[in-house]
Amino acid sequence: MTVTERITALRKQMKEKGIDAYLVPTDDFHGSEYVGDYFKCRKYITGFTGSAGTAVIMQDMAGLWTDGRYFIQAAQQLEGTPVTLFKMGEPDVPTIHKFLEENLKEGMCLGFDGRTVSAEEAETLEKILQKKQVHFSVNEDLIGNIWDDRPALSCEPVMELSEKWAGRSRADKIREIRSKLKEKGADLFILTSLDDIAWLLNIRGNDIHCCPVVLSYLVLDDSELRLFVNEKAFSDSVKEALSKDGIAIYPYDDIYTYVQTIPEEKKVFLSRSNVNSRLVSSIPKTVTILDGENLTLLPKAIKNETEVQNEKTAHLKDGVAMVKFIHWLKKNVGMKEITELSAADKLYEFRSGQENFQGNSFDPIIAYGAHGAIVHYSATEETNIPLEPKGLVLMDTGGHYLEGTTDITRTVVLGPVTEKEKKYFTAVLRGHLNLAAAKFRYGCTGLNLDALARGPLWAMGEDYNHGTGHGVGYLLNVHEGPQSFRWKSPAALPAPVLEEGMITSDEPGYYAENEFGIRHENLVVCKKAEKTSYGQFMKFEPLTLVPFDLEGIDPEQMEAGERKLLNQYHAFVYEKISPYLNEEEQSWLKKATQEI
Protein backbone atom coordinates (compact mmCIF):
# COMPACT_ATOMS: atom_id res chain seq x y z
CA MET A 1 0.00 0.00 0.00
CA THR A 2 1.14 3.56 -0.67
CA VAL A 3 0.99 6.21 2.08
CA THR A 4 -2.20 7.56 0.45
CA GLU A 5 -3.82 4.10 0.53
CA ARG A 6 -2.77 3.55 4.16
CA ILE A 7 -4.29 6.86 5.23
CA THR A 8 -7.52 5.99 3.37
CA ALA A 9 -7.64 2.61 5.19
CA LEU A 10 -6.98 4.32 8.55
CA ARG A 11 -9.77 6.86 7.93
CA LYS A 12 -12.17 4.00 7.24
CA GLN A 13 -11.22 2.44 10.62
CA MET A 14 -11.65 5.82 12.34
CA LYS A 15 -15.13 6.24 10.87
CA GLU A 16 -16.17 2.76 12.04
CA LYS A 17 -14.90 3.46 15.59
CA GLY A 18 -16.29 7.01 15.79
CA ILE A 19 -12.82 8.58 16.06
CA ASP A 20 -12.45 12.08 14.54
CA ALA A 21 -8.69 12.57 14.99
CA TYR A 22 -6.06 9.87 15.49
CA LEU A 23 -2.68 10.64 17.03
CA VAL A 24 0.33 8.54 15.99
CA PRO A 25 3.51 9.28 17.99
CA THR A 26 6.96 7.80 17.34
CA ASP A 27 7.01 6.02 20.71
CA ASP A 28 6.98 2.37 21.68
CA PHE A 29 5.31 1.28 24.97
CA HIS A 30 8.36 2.54 26.92
CA GLY A 31 8.87 6.11 25.69
CA SER A 32 12.07 5.10 23.87
CA GLU A 33 13.69 7.64 21.54
CA TYR A 34 14.42 5.00 18.89
CA VAL A 35 11.96 2.15 18.49
CA GLY A 36 11.92 -1.42 17.19
CA ASP A 37 10.39 -2.22 13.79
CA TYR A 38 7.13 -3.45 15.38
CA PHE A 39 6.53 0.05 16.77
CA LYS A 40 7.21 2.11 13.63
CA CYS A 41 3.55 3.12 13.16
CA ARG A 42 4.28 6.77 12.41
CA LYS A 43 6.76 5.78 9.70
CA TYR A 44 4.19 3.34 8.28
CA ILE A 45 1.39 5.90 8.06
CA THR A 46 3.42 8.92 6.79
CA GLY A 47 6.50 7.49 5.03
CA PHE A 48 8.75 9.78 7.14
CA THR A 49 11.68 7.79 8.56
CA GLY A 50 13.24 10.29 11.03
CA SER A 51 13.61 9.42 14.72
CA ALA A 52 11.27 12.17 16.00
CA GLY A 53 7.83 13.27 14.93
CA THR A 54 4.10 12.87 15.53
CA ALA A 55 1.30 12.41 13.01
CA VAL A 56 -2.30 13.55 13.35
CA ILE A 57 -4.85 12.08 10.94
CA MET A 58 -8.37 13.50 10.49
CA GLN A 59 -10.92 12.85 7.73
CA ASP A 60 -9.94 16.03 5.87
CA MET A 61 -6.26 16.45 6.80
CA ALA A 62 -3.09 14.57 7.69
CA GLY A 63 -0.18 16.33 9.38
CA LEU A 64 3.32 15.50 10.59
CA TRP A 65 5.05 17.57 13.28
CA THR A 66 8.85 17.28 13.54
CA ASP A 67 11.80 19.38 14.77
CA GLY A 68 14.57 21.39 13.08
CA ARG A 69 16.85 18.38 12.62
CA TYR A 70 14.38 16.89 10.16
CA PHE A 71 12.79 19.79 8.23
CA ILE A 72 14.69 19.07 5.00
CA GLN A 73 14.35 15.28 5.19
CA ALA A 74 10.64 15.38 6.08
CA ALA A 75 9.84 17.79 3.22
CA GLN A 76 11.54 15.38 0.79
CA GLN A 77 9.87 12.23 2.17
CA LEU A 78 6.35 13.70 2.41
CA GLU A 79 6.36 14.96 -1.18
CA GLY A 80 3.55 13.36 -3.19
CA THR A 81 1.66 12.19 -0.07
CA PRO A 82 -1.44 13.77 1.51
CA VAL A 83 0.64 14.59 4.62
CA THR A 84 1.36 18.25 5.44
CA LEU A 85 4.62 19.12 7.25
CA PHE A 86 4.31 21.24 10.41
CA LYS A 87 7.76 22.64 11.28
CA MET A 88 7.85 22.67 15.09
CA GLY A 89 9.08 25.89 16.65
CA GLU A 90 8.79 27.96 13.47
CA PRO A 91 6.75 31.22 13.54
CA ASP A 92 3.02 30.76 12.81
CA VAL A 93 3.24 26.97 13.03
CA PRO A 94 0.74 25.70 15.63
CA THR A 95 1.87 23.08 18.14
CA ILE A 96 -0.01 19.77 18.05
CA HIS A 97 -1.90 20.84 21.18
CA LYS A 98 -2.91 24.17 19.62
CA PHE A 99 -3.89 22.45 16.38
CA LEU A 100 -6.13 19.91 18.14
CA GLU A 101 -7.65 22.64 20.30
CA GLU A 102 -8.54 24.68 17.20
CA ASN A 103 -9.62 21.83 14.91
CA LEU A 104 -11.55 19.44 17.16
CA LYS A 105 -15.15 20.54 17.50
CA GLU A 106 -17.31 20.10 20.57
CA GLY A 107 -18.03 16.48 21.46
CA MET A 108 -15.58 15.04 18.94
CA CYS A 109 -13.36 12.03 19.71
CA LEU A 110 -9.55 11.91 19.81
CA GLY A 111 -7.99 8.46 19.51
CA PHE A 112 -4.55 6.99 20.18
CA ASP A 113 -2.99 3.76 21.44
CA GLY A 114 -2.60 4.56 25.15
CA ARG A 115 0.49 2.35 25.35
CA THR A 116 2.38 4.76 23.05
CA VAL A 117 1.48 8.02 24.82
CA SER A 118 2.90 8.93 28.22
CA ALA A 119 0.55 9.47 31.16
CA GLU A 120 1.74 13.09 31.36
CA GLU A 121 0.96 13.77 27.69
CA ALA A 122 -2.47 12.09 27.92
CA GLU A 123 -3.35 14.24 30.96
CA THR A 124 -2.19 17.39 29.13
CA LEU A 125 -4.41 16.52 26.14
CA GLU A 126 -7.37 15.91 28.45
CA LYS A 127 -6.89 19.31 30.13
CA ILE A 128 -6.52 21.18 26.84
CA LEU A 129 -9.56 19.56 25.22
CA GLN A 130 -11.76 19.58 28.34
CA LYS A 131 -13.65 22.74 27.47
CA LYS A 132 -14.57 21.30 24.07
CA GLN A 133 -15.87 18.18 25.84
CA VAL A 134 -13.72 16.08 23.54
CA HIS A 135 -13.79 12.42 24.54
CA PHE A 136 -11.00 9.90 24.14
CA SER A 137 -10.58 6.44 22.64
CA VAL A 138 -7.26 5.15 23.96
CA ASN A 139 -7.41 1.37 23.64
CA GLU A 140 -7.32 1.14 19.85
CA ASP A 141 -4.20 0.26 17.87
CA LEU A 142 -5.75 1.29 14.55
CA ILE A 143 -2.45 1.16 12.65
CA GLY A 144 -2.05 -2.45 13.79
CA ASN A 145 -5.46 -3.21 12.28
CA ILE A 146 -4.39 -2.10 8.78
CA TRP A 147 -0.69 -3.11 8.85
CA ASP A 148 -0.75 -6.56 7.24
CA ASP A 149 2.93 -7.50 7.24
CA ARG A 150 3.77 -5.88 10.58
CA PRO A 151 7.07 -7.23 12.01
CA ALA A 152 6.88 -9.29 15.22
CA LEU A 153 7.87 -7.87 18.62
CA SER A 154 11.63 -8.27 19.00
CA CYS A 155 12.92 -11.07 21.25
CA GLU A 156 16.71 -11.00 20.92
CA PRO A 157 18.96 -12.97 23.32
CA VAL A 158 19.81 -11.26 26.62
CA MET A 159 23.36 -11.16 28.01
CA GLU A 160 24.62 -10.33 31.48
CA LEU A 161 27.04 -7.42 31.83
CA SER A 162 29.63 -8.54 34.36
CA GLU A 163 30.84 -6.34 37.20
CA LYS A 164 34.18 -6.02 35.39
CA TRP A 165 32.35 -3.80 32.89
CA ALA A 166 29.50 -2.38 35.00
CA GLY A 167 31.62 -1.51 38.04
CA ARG A 168 28.77 -2.44 40.42
CA SER A 169 26.68 -5.53 41.09
CA ARG A 170 22.96 -5.49 40.38
CA ALA A 171 22.33 -6.31 44.06
CA ASP A 172 24.16 -3.12 45.03
CA LYS A 173 22.17 -1.03 42.53
CA ILE A 174 18.86 -2.55 43.67
CA ARG A 175 19.74 -1.72 47.30
CA GLU A 176 20.39 1.91 46.31
CA ILE A 177 17.06 2.19 44.46
CA ARG A 178 15.17 0.57 47.37
CA SER A 179 16.66 3.10 49.74
CA LYS A 180 15.68 5.96 47.38
CA LEU A 181 12.15 4.50 47.22
CA LYS A 182 11.99 4.55 51.02
CA GLU A 183 13.15 8.19 51.07
CA LYS A 184 10.25 9.03 48.74
CA GLY A 185 7.81 7.41 51.18
CA ALA A 186 6.56 4.98 48.51
CA ASP A 187 5.93 1.21 48.56
CA LEU A 188 6.40 0.33 44.87
CA PHE A 189 8.48 1.68 42.01
CA ILE A 190 7.23 1.10 38.46
CA LEU A 191 10.02 1.40 35.89
CA THR A 192 9.34 1.11 32.16
CA SER A 193 12.33 2.91 30.55
CA LEU A 194 14.30 0.19 28.81
CA ASP A 195 17.79 1.61 29.35
CA ASP A 196 17.09 2.16 33.06
CA ILE A 197 15.99 -1.46 33.47
CA ALA A 198 19.08 -2.72 31.59
CA TRP A 199 21.33 -0.51 33.74
CA LEU A 200 19.71 -1.60 37.03
CA LEU A 201 19.84 -5.34 36.29
CA ASN A 202 23.23 -5.36 34.48
CA ILE A 203 21.66 -6.96 31.42
CA ARG A 204 21.92 -5.98 27.76
CA GLY A 205 19.87 -7.05 24.75
CA ASN A 206 19.28 -6.03 21.17
CA ASP A 207 15.55 -5.26 20.95
CA ILE A 208 16.05 -1.84 19.36
CA HIS A 209 18.44 -1.36 16.44
CA CYS A 210 21.75 -0.01 17.85
CA CYS A 211 20.34 0.19 21.41
CA PRO A 212 21.37 -2.78 23.60
CA VAL A 213 18.09 -2.93 25.56
CA VAL A 214 15.52 -5.61 26.42
CA LEU A 215 11.75 -5.08 25.98
CA SER A 216 10.65 -5.14 29.62
CA TYR A 217 8.73 -3.57 32.50
CA LEU A 218 9.87 -3.69 36.12
CA VAL A 219 8.10 -3.36 39.47
CA LEU A 220 10.15 -3.17 42.66
CA ASP A 221 9.11 -3.05 46.31
CA ASP A 222 11.09 -3.50 49.53
CA SER A 223 11.27 -7.28 49.18
CA GLU A 224 10.38 -8.29 45.61
CA LEU A 225 11.42 -7.36 42.10
CA ARG A 226 9.16 -8.39 39.21
CA LEU A 227 10.47 -8.31 35.65
CA PHE A 228 7.91 -8.51 32.82
CA VAL A 229 9.63 -9.83 29.68
CA ASN A 230 9.51 -12.42 26.93
CA GLU A 231 11.16 -15.29 28.81
CA LYS A 232 12.35 -16.86 25.52
CA ALA A 233 15.03 -14.14 25.28
CA PHE A 234 16.71 -15.38 28.49
CA SER A 235 19.09 -18.33 28.70
CA ASP A 236 18.85 -20.64 31.73
CA SER A 237 22.09 -19.24 33.16
CA VAL A 238 20.87 -15.61 32.96
CA LYS A 239 17.51 -16.61 34.51
CA GLU A 240 19.34 -18.41 37.30
CA ALA A 241 21.58 -15.41 38.01
CA LEU A 242 18.57 -13.07 38.13
CA SER A 243 16.69 -15.48 40.38
CA LYS A 244 19.65 -15.55 42.81
CA ASP A 245 19.24 -11.79 43.19
CA GLY A 246 15.53 -12.17 43.96
CA ILE A 247 14.21 -11.23 40.51
CA ALA A 248 11.03 -13.03 39.41
CA ILE A 249 10.17 -13.21 35.70
CA TYR A 250 6.61 -12.74 34.36
CA PRO A 251 5.19 -12.52 30.80
CA TYR A 252 5.73 -9.11 29.11
CA ASP A 253 2.06 -8.14 28.72
CA ASP A 254 1.06 -9.23 32.25
CA ILE A 255 2.14 -5.85 33.67
CA TYR A 256 -1.28 -4.39 32.75
CA THR A 257 -3.23 -6.98 34.76
CA TYR A 258 -0.64 -6.99 37.57
CA VAL A 259 -0.96 -3.25 38.30
CA GLN A 260 -4.76 -3.67 38.59
CA THR A 261 -4.12 -5.82 41.69
CA ILE A 262 -2.01 -3.26 43.61
CA PRO A 263 -3.65 -2.95 47.08
CA GLU A 264 -5.47 0.35 47.62
CA GLU A 265 -3.40 1.52 50.60
CA LYS A 266 -0.14 1.36 48.62
CA LYS A 267 1.87 4.32 47.36
CA VAL A 268 3.37 3.90 43.89
CA PHE A 269 6.32 5.95 42.64
CA LEU A 270 6.69 6.40 38.88
CA SER A 271 7.58 8.96 36.23
CA ARG A 272 4.41 10.11 34.45
CA SER A 273 6.54 11.50 31.62
CA ASN A 274 7.95 7.99 30.98
CA VAL A 275 5.24 5.50 31.93
CA ASN A 276 2.51 5.06 29.33
CA SER A 277 -1.02 6.25 29.96
CA ARG A 278 -2.69 2.84 29.63
CA LEU A 279 -0.47 1.43 32.37
CA VAL A 280 -1.11 4.36 34.73
CA SER A 281 -4.87 4.27 34.08
CA SER A 282 -4.85 0.51 34.88
CA ILE A 283 -3.70 1.26 38.47
CA PRO A 284 -6.72 1.34 40.85
CA LYS A 285 -7.89 4.92 41.51
CA THR A 286 -7.55 4.39 45.28
CA VAL A 287 -3.78 3.84 45.00
CA THR A 288 -1.67 6.95 45.65
CA ILE A 289 0.66 7.77 42.75
CA LEU A 290 3.79 9.80 43.48
CA ASP A 291 5.28 11.36 40.35
CA GLY A 292 8.97 12.15 39.87
CA GLU A 293 11.93 11.45 37.65
CA ASN A 294 13.01 7.81 37.55
CA LEU A 295 15.00 6.87 40.67
CA THR A 296 17.55 5.25 38.34
CA LEU A 297 18.09 8.34 36.16
CA LEU A 298 20.94 10.04 38.05
CA PRO A 299 22.77 6.91 39.28
CA LYS A 300 22.82 5.70 35.65
CA ALA A 301 24.08 9.08 34.32
CA ILE A 302 26.86 9.42 36.91
CA LYS A 303 29.37 6.85 35.69
CA ASN A 304 31.38 5.09 38.40
CA GLU A 305 35.20 4.99 38.34
CA THR A 306 35.26 1.58 36.60
CA GLU A 307 32.90 2.80 33.88
CA VAL A 308 34.95 5.97 33.30
CA GLN A 309 38.21 4.00 33.03
CA ASN A 310 36.53 1.48 30.70
CA GLU A 311 35.16 4.32 28.57
CA LYS A 312 38.70 5.65 28.14
CA THR A 313 39.67 2.23 26.75
CA ALA A 314 36.62 2.22 24.44
CA HIS A 315 37.57 5.66 23.11
CA LEU A 316 41.19 4.62 22.60
CA LYS A 317 40.01 1.68 20.46
CA ASP A 318 37.52 3.88 18.64
CA GLY A 319 40.18 6.53 18.07
CA VAL A 320 42.51 3.97 16.49
CA ALA A 321 39.70 2.77 14.18
CA MET A 322 38.72 6.34 13.23
CA VAL A 323 42.30 7.47 12.55
CA LYS A 324 42.97 4.42 10.37
CA PHE A 325 39.72 5.11 8.52
CA ILE A 326 40.33 8.85 7.94
CA HIS A 327 43.87 8.07 6.72
CA TRP A 328 42.45 5.43 4.33
CA LEU A 329 39.72 7.82 3.13
CA LYS A 330 42.06 10.72 2.37
CA LYS A 331 44.48 8.40 0.60
CA ASN A 332 41.83 6.75 -1.60
CA VAL A 333 39.22 9.42 -2.36
CA GLY A 334 39.35 10.16 -6.09
CA MET A 335 41.51 7.07 -6.69
CA LYS A 336 38.73 4.48 -6.30
CA GLU A 337 34.96 4.79 -6.03
CA ILE A 338 33.92 5.52 -2.46
CA THR A 339 30.27 6.34 -1.72
CA GLU A 340 28.56 7.45 1.49
CA LEU A 341 27.37 3.88 2.07
CA SER A 342 30.65 2.16 1.18
CA ALA A 343 32.56 4.60 3.43
CA ALA A 344 30.24 3.64 6.32
CA ASP A 345 30.92 -0.06 5.61
CA LYS A 346 34.68 0.56 5.57
CA LEU A 347 34.53 2.38 8.92
CA TYR A 348 32.52 -0.54 10.35
CA GLU A 349 35.30 -2.85 9.14
CA PHE A 350 37.93 -0.79 11.03
CA ARG A 351 35.81 -0.74 14.21
CA SER A 352 35.12 -4.48 13.96
CA GLY A 353 38.86 -5.07 14.10
CA GLN A 354 38.86 -3.77 17.69
CA GLU A 355 38.44 -6.28 20.52
CA ASN A 356 35.05 -6.33 22.31
CA PHE A 357 33.35 -4.27 19.57
CA GLN A 358 29.58 -4.90 19.84
CA GLY A 359 28.23 -2.92 16.86
CA ASN A 360 27.30 0.63 15.88
CA SER A 361 25.80 2.87 18.58
CA PHE A 362 23.52 4.45 15.93
CA ASP A 363 23.19 4.37 12.15
CA PRO A 364 26.28 6.12 10.78
CA ILE A 365 25.84 9.54 9.21
CA ILE A 366 28.25 9.90 6.31
CA ALA A 367 27.03 13.07 4.60
CA TYR A 368 28.96 14.46 1.64
CA GLY A 369 28.64 18.04 0.38
CA ALA A 370 25.05 19.33 0.49
CA HIS A 371 23.93 16.21 2.39
CA GLY A 372 25.94 17.52 5.36
CA ALA A 373 23.35 20.27 5.80
CA ILE A 374 20.71 17.64 6.65
CA VAL A 375 21.40 17.34 10.38
CA HIS A 376 20.43 13.69 10.82
CA TYR A 377 20.97 12.53 7.24
CA SER A 378 21.18 8.79 6.76
CA ALA A 379 22.28 7.57 3.32
CA THR A 380 19.97 5.13 1.54
CA GLU A 381 20.37 3.33 -1.80
CA GLU A 382 18.33 6.18 -3.35
CA THR A 383 20.27 9.10 -1.81
CA ASN A 384 23.75 7.52 -1.80
CA ILE A 385 26.36 9.60 -3.68
CA PRO A 386 30.09 9.18 -4.39
CA LEU A 387 32.66 11.12 -2.36
CA GLU A 388 34.81 13.36 -4.57
CA PRO A 389 38.28 14.83 -3.93
CA LYS A 390 36.85 18.24 -3.03
CA GLY A 391 34.76 19.84 -0.31
CA LEU A 392 33.65 18.43 3.05
CA VAL A 393 32.22 15.16 4.32
CA LEU A 394 30.48 15.19 7.72
CA MET A 395 30.78 11.86 9.57
CA ASP A 396 28.78 11.36 12.76
CA THR A 397 29.26 7.77 13.94
CA GLY A 398 29.75 5.70 17.07
CA GLY A 399 30.37 2.24 18.41
CA HIS A 400 29.40 0.02 21.31
CA TYR A 401 32.16 -1.87 23.11
CA LEU A 402 32.02 -3.92 26.31
CA GLU A 403 34.06 -0.96 27.63
CA GLY A 404 31.33 1.55 26.76
CA THR A 405 29.70 3.63 24.03
CA THR A 406 31.28 6.19 21.69
CA ASP A 407 29.83 9.02 19.61
CA ILE A 408 32.09 11.18 17.43
CA THR A 409 31.64 13.64 14.58
CA ARG A 410 34.47 14.73 12.32
CA THR A 411 34.09 16.97 9.29
CA VAL A 412 36.83 15.86 6.91
CA VAL A 413 38.33 17.89 4.05
CA LEU A 414 38.49 15.75 0.89
CA GLY A 415 40.12 18.37 -1.37
CA PRO A 416 39.86 22.09 -2.17
CA VAL A 417 37.44 23.99 0.13
CA THR A 418 35.93 27.47 -0.19
CA GLU A 419 36.69 30.45 2.05
CA LYS A 420 33.12 30.19 3.37
CA GLU A 421 33.61 26.54 4.34
CA LYS A 422 36.87 27.38 6.13
CA LYS A 423 35.31 30.34 7.92
CA TYR A 424 32.52 28.24 9.43
CA PHE A 425 34.70 25.17 9.97
CA THR A 426 36.93 27.35 12.16
CA ALA A 427 34.10 29.17 13.96
CA VAL A 428 32.43 25.89 14.93
CA LEU A 429 35.76 24.44 16.11
CA ARG A 430 36.42 27.52 18.27
CA GLY A 431 33.04 27.00 19.97
CA HIS A 432 33.80 23.32 20.52
CA LEU A 433 37.20 24.11 22.09
CA ASN A 434 35.74 26.87 24.31
CA LEU A 435 33.16 24.54 25.82
CA ALA A 436 35.65 21.67 26.23
CA ALA A 437 38.00 23.98 28.15
CA ALA A 438 35.31 25.37 30.48
CA LYS A 439 36.02 25.59 34.18
CA PHE A 440 32.94 26.31 36.27
CA ARG A 441 31.56 26.27 39.78
CA TYR A 442 29.80 23.13 40.94
CA GLY A 443 26.06 23.70 40.56
CA CYS A 444 26.20 24.78 36.93
CA THR A 445 23.98 23.04 34.39
CA GLY A 446 24.40 22.65 30.66
CA LEU A 447 22.25 25.78 30.25
CA ASN A 448 24.95 27.87 31.93
CA LEU A 449 27.67 26.68 29.55
CA ASP A 450 25.98 26.30 26.17
CA ALA A 451 26.75 29.87 25.01
CA LEU A 452 30.48 29.05 25.12
CA ALA A 453 29.94 26.71 22.15
CA ARG A 454 27.55 28.99 20.26
CA GLY A 455 29.48 32.22 20.98
CA PRO A 456 31.65 32.37 17.83
CA LEU A 457 28.61 31.69 15.60
CA TRP A 458 26.35 34.07 17.54
CA ALA A 459 28.97 36.80 17.04
CA MET A 460 28.43 36.27 13.28
CA GLY A 461 24.63 36.29 13.61
CA GLU A 462 24.54 32.53 12.95
CA ASP A 463 23.43 29.46 14.95
CA TYR A 464 22.44 25.79 14.66
CA ASN A 465 19.04 24.20 15.28
CA HIS A 466 20.00 21.47 17.73
CA GLY A 467 21.32 21.05 21.25
CA THR A 468 25.07 21.35 21.73
CA GLY A 469 25.34 18.12 23.68
CA HIS A 470 23.59 15.10 25.20
CA GLY A 471 24.47 12.51 27.81
CA VAL A 472 25.72 9.12 26.61
CA GLY A 473 25.02 5.70 28.14
CA TYR A 474 27.47 2.91 29.03
CA LEU A 475 26.91 0.22 26.40
CA LEU A 476 23.39 1.66 26.30
CA ASN A 477 21.55 4.47 24.52
CA VAL A 478 23.80 6.94 22.76
CA HIS A 479 21.34 9.68 23.81
CA GLU A 480 20.93 9.49 27.58
CA GLY A 481 19.53 12.03 30.04
CA PRO A 482 19.24 13.96 32.13
CA GLN A 483 22.13 16.36 31.41
CA SER A 484 22.61 18.24 28.15
CA PHE A 485 24.11 21.42 26.71
CA ARG A 486 21.36 23.64 25.31
CA TRP A 487 20.65 27.37 25.39
CA LYS A 488 16.98 27.15 26.35
CA SER A 489 15.26 24.56 28.47
CA PRO A 490 11.97 22.98 27.41
CA ALA A 491 9.66 22.87 30.44
CA ALA A 492 9.60 19.07 30.23
CA LEU A 493 13.39 18.81 30.55
CA PRO A 494 14.63 20.24 33.85
CA ALA A 495 18.32 21.11 33.67
CA PRO A 496 20.27 18.94 36.13
CA VAL A 497 23.57 19.92 37.72
CA LEU A 498 26.69 18.64 35.94
CA GLU A 499 28.11 15.96 38.23
CA GLU A 500 31.49 14.26 38.31
CA GLY A 501 31.32 11.15 36.11
CA MET A 502 28.68 12.44 33.70
CA ILE A 503 29.64 11.86 30.05
CA THR A 504 28.27 14.42 27.59
CA SER A 505 28.82 15.27 23.93
CA ASP A 506 30.22 18.64 22.82
CA GLU A 507 28.97 19.05 19.24
CA PRO A 508 28.31 22.52 17.82
CA GLY A 509 27.60 22.71 14.08
CA TYR A 510 26.82 24.93 11.12
CA TYR A 511 24.55 24.03 8.18
CA ALA A 512 24.33 25.87 4.86
CA GLU A 513 21.30 24.38 3.11
CA ASN A 514 22.10 22.85 -0.30
CA GLU A 515 25.81 23.60 0.24
CA PHE A 516 27.55 21.86 3.17
CA GLY A 517 27.37 20.96 6.85
CA ILE A 518 29.97 21.11 9.62
CA ARG A 519 29.91 19.49 13.07
CA HIS A 520 32.77 18.81 15.47
CA GLU A 521 31.95 16.36 18.28
CA ASN A 522 33.89 14.86 21.16
CA LEU A 523 32.59 13.16 24.29
CA VAL A 524 33.79 14.76 27.52
CA VAL A 525 33.64 13.47 31.09
CA CYS A 526 32.93 15.89 33.94
CA LYS A 527 35.68 15.94 36.61
CA LYS A 528 36.43 17.84 39.80
CA ALA A 529 38.91 20.71 39.45
CA GLU A 530 40.25 22.59 42.48
CA LYS A 531 38.29 23.64 45.56
CA THR A 532 38.61 27.28 46.66
CA SER A 533 36.90 29.58 49.13
CA TYR A 534 34.10 29.81 46.53
CA GLY A 535 33.56 26.07 46.64
CA GLN A 536 34.19 23.18 44.27
CA PHE A 537 35.13 23.92 40.66
CA MET A 538 34.55 21.47 37.81
CA LYS A 539 36.08 20.84 34.38
CA PHE A 540 35.85 18.48 31.41
CA GLU A 541 38.29 15.87 30.19
CA PRO A 542 38.06 14.74 26.55
CA LEU A 543 37.41 11.04 25.94
CA THR A 544 37.43 11.14 22.11
CA LEU A 545 40.90 10.78 20.57
CA VAL A 546 40.77 11.82 16.89
CA PRO A 547 42.33 14.90 15.26
CA PHE A 548 40.27 17.76 13.81
CA ASP A 549 41.12 18.30 10.14
CA LEU A 550 43.81 21.02 9.96
CA GLU A 551 43.06 21.53 6.26
CA GLY A 552 39.68 23.04 7.18
CA ILE A 553 41.06 25.53 9.69
CA ASP A 554 41.95 29.19 9.17
CA PRO A 555 44.40 29.80 12.08
CA GLU A 556 44.11 33.57 11.55
CA GLN A 557 40.52 33.43 12.84
CA MET A 558 41.61 31.78 16.07
CA GLU A 559 42.87 33.48 19.20
CA ALA A 560 46.25 32.37 20.55
CA GLY A 561 44.54 30.61 23.49
CA GLU A 562 42.29 28.64 21.11
CA ARG A 563 45.25 27.56 18.97
CA LYS A 564 47.00 26.42 22.15
CA LEU A 565 43.96 24.35 23.18
CA LEU A 566 43.88 22.67 19.76
CA ASN A 567 47.63 21.99 19.80
CA GLN A 568 47.42 20.48 23.31
CA TYR A 569 44.53 18.24 22.27
CA HIS A 570 46.33 17.12 19.12
CA ALA A 571 49.54 16.32 21.05
CA PHE A 572 47.42 14.20 23.44
CA VAL A 573 45.79 12.37 20.49
CA TYR A 574 49.17 11.60 18.91
CA GLU A 575 50.63 10.32 22.17
CA LYS A 576 47.68 7.97 22.83
CA ILE A 577 46.92 6.71 19.30
CA SER A 578 50.28 6.51 17.49
CA PRO A 579 51.53 3.30 19.22
CA TYR A 580 48.64 1.36 17.62
CA LEU A 581 49.34 2.46 14.01
CA ASN A 582 51.63 1.21 11.26
CA GLU A 583 54.49 3.42 10.04
CA GLU A 584 52.56 5.06 7.19
CA GLU A 585 49.58 5.82 9.46
CA GLN A 586 51.91 7.17 12.15
CA SER A 587 53.59 9.65 9.83
CA TRP A 588 50.16 10.74 8.54
CA LEU A 589 48.93 11.26 12.14
CA LYS A 590 52.12 13.20 13.00
CA LYS A 591 51.27 15.67 10.22
CA ALA A 592 47.54 15.68 11.08
CA THR A 593 48.33 16.71 14.68
CA GLN A 594 51.17 19.18 14.01
CA GLU A 595 51.10 22.53 15.82
CA ILE A 596 49.41 25.47 14.15
Task: Give each language-model segment a name.
Residues 1-596:
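Active-site neighborhoods and metal-handling regions in enzymes and metal-associated proteins
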